[in-house]
Swiss-Prot record:
PTM per Swiss-Prot/TrEMBL: Phosphorylated by MAPK1 and CDK2.
Species this protein is from: Mus musculus
Biased composition (Low complexity): 9-44
Chain spans, region Disordered: 1-47
Any single Gene Ontology cellular-component annotation: cytoplasm
Record's protein name: Cyclin-dependent kinase 2-associated protein 2
Entry function: Acts as a component of the histone deacetylase NuRD complex which participates in the remodeling of chromatin. Inhibits cell cycle G1/S phase transition by repressing CDK2 expression and activation; represses CDK2 activation by inhibiting its interaction with cyclin E and A. Plays a role in regulating the self-renewal of embryonic stem cells (ESCs) and in maintaining cell survival during terminal differentiation of ESCs. Regulates microtubule organization of metaphase II oocytes.
Tissues expressing the protein: Oocytes (at protein level).
Cell membrane keyword on record: no
Region called Interaction with CDK2, residue ranges: 65-107
Pfam families: CDK2AP
UniProt keyword Phosphoprotein, yes or no: yes
């Protein structure tokens, strides 16, 4: 079974047809690039996520002082990440690329939190 994306329905409204001779058509130079770069310039490849180490998720995680309730908040963070990931399952299955990317980032974040929880559990078991 192969995945086939659903094509958007053609937008044909009554009264609208192809542009006539008096309708201005934008040229390639007048349309801004979605990336904001110079047209024709190749953007360097940059991966969307990195699975080596904990993810940054757009913010810097603060270091917790020893003896704080870090494990409880890490576990709570993990539960909330899993809950958010659950909301992305159905849109991902329906073909949403943005939901798929959010789900990927959520999985990576959850894996990092699980590693933190396991490390905390091992530290507590040794003491």
């Amino acid at each position: 079974m192969s995945y086939k994306p659903i094509a958007p329905a053609p937008s044909s409204t009554p009264g609208s047809s192809t542009p006539g001779p008096g309708t201005p058509v934008p040229t390639a130079g007048s349309v801004p690039s979605p990336s904001g770069s110079v047209p024709g310039a190749a953007a360097p490849f940059r991966p969307l996520f990195n699975d080596f180490g904990p993810p940054s998720m757009g913010y810097v995680q603060a270091m917790k002082p020893p003896g704080s309730q870090g494990s409880q908040s890490t576990y709570t963070d993990l539960l909330s990440v899993i809950e958010e990931m659950g909301k992305e399952i159905r849109p991902t299955y329906a073909g949403s690329k943005s939901a798929m990317e959010r789900l990927k980032r959520g999985i990576i974040h959850a894996r990092a939190l699980v590693r933190e929880c396991l490390a905390e559990t091992e530290r507590n078991a040794r003491t």
